[in-house]
């Protein structure tokens, strides 16, 4: 009997603890595929979990609908060499990172993290995907976390440098792509007491802000198995090698009433 009880509990641990749960924030679009049964986390089917637009489905099915390819599962969709998952909560960066790790599909060899943007194509695709999920998206410039962060190391008494989440296999490569807004990164903000993270605006540009501000976010992880030459990261001191111009000229609006009530505003 004890062995049977253990076997029954293990699947629940795998599928239950890695999902947000129902009703955790405003919807931001229609569901993206039919649910596949009574799962324990939010699905991506109609009414089966928080969407990313006017759709407000609340439920606990674990949908298997997919966008951009079949290499991503459990509500994750493919952009380039990464699987993405849009989350419906505004969290501090560290809490967002933890939620991304917990939401990685079972059996994944690498951790998920707050979204990594290794190139201009990924940046464009992420913004276009946000726009496609709703007829109203981003006009009030709802900020989103990126995974880029610069943490203060109290032991070494220095900043660690701008880098992407540690779940990437190419962590030791330099930062080859940046899309900082004009006059960013603003090093005058760094006060040797707080860690700083990069948030993305509706144009895809990055701004330096303290990591303890709540913002909306998306998770990303390499396709499994990771492809060669995937992410560009930086464990060093954040030397910038390029700064592209703004990448999106048009935009649409978010459902501002719902989002603003969560304390997330523009730049």
Curated annotation (Swiss-Prot):
SUPFAM superfamilies for this protein: C-type lectin-like
Domain of life: Eukaryota
InterPro entries in the record: C-type_lectin-like (IPR001304), C-type_lectin-like/link_sf (IPR016186), C-type_lectin/snaclec_domain (IPR050111), CTDL_fold (IPR016187)
Subcellular location: Secreted
Region span, 11 X 4 AA tandem repeats of G-[PQ]-G-[MQ]: 20-64
First and last residue of the signal peptide: 1-16
Keywords of the record: Disulfide bond, Repeat, Secreted, Signal
Expression (tissue specificity): Expressed specifically in the micromere/primary mesenchyme cells (PMC) lineage. Produced uniformly and exclusively by PMCs through the early prism stage and this specificity is further restricted during skeletogenesis to a subpopulation of PMCs associated with the growing tips of the spicules.
GO terms under cellular component: extracellular region
Sequence repeat extents: 21-24, 25-28, 29-32, 33-36, 37-40, 41-44, 45-48, 49-52, 53-56, 57-60, 61-64
Intrachain S-S bonds: 100-219, 197-211
Region annotation (Disordered) ranges: 44-68
Pfam families in UniProt: Lectin_C (PF00059)
Keyword Disulfide bond: yes
Residues of the C-type lectin domain: 79-220
Main function: May play a role in the regulation or execution of skeletal growth.
Domain-related comment: The repetitive domain may provide a calcite binding matrix.
Name listed for the protein in its UniProt record: 27 kDa primary mesenchyme-specific spicule protein
């Amino acid at each position: 009997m004890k062995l049977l009880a253990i076997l029954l509990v293990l699947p629940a641990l795998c599928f239950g603890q890695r999902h947000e749960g129902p009703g955790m924030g405003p919807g931001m679009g229609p569901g993206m595929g039919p649910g596949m049964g009574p799962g324990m986390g939010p699905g991506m089917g109609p009414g089966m979990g928080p969407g990313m637009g006017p759709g407000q489905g609340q439920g606990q099915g674990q949908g298997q609908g997919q966008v951009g390819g079949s290499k991503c599962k459990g509500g994750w969709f493919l952009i380039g060499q990464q699987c993405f998952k849009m989350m419906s909560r505004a969290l501090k960066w560290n809490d967002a990172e933890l939620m991304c790790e917990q939401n990685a599909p079972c059996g994944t060899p690498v951790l998920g993290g707050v979204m990594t943007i290794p190139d201009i194509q990924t940046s464009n695709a992420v913004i276009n995907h946000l726009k496609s999920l709703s007829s109203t998206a981003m006009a009030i410039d709802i900020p989103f976390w990126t995974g880029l962060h610069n943490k203060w190391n109290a032991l070494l008494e220095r900043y660690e440098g701008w880098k992407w989440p540690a779940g990437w296999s190419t962590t030791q490569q330099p930062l080859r792509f940046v899309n900082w807004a004009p006059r960013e990164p603003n090093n005058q903000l760094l006060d040797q007491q707080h860690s700083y993270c990069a948030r993305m605006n509706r144009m895809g540009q990055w701004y330096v802000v303290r990591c303890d501000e709540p913002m909306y976010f998306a998770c990303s992880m390499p396709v499994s198995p990771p492809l060669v030459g995937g992410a560009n990261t930086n464990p060093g001191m954040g030397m910038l090698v390029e700064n592209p111009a703004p990448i999106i000229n048009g935009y649409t609006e978010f459902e501002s009433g719902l989002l603003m009530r969560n304390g997330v505003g523009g730049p």
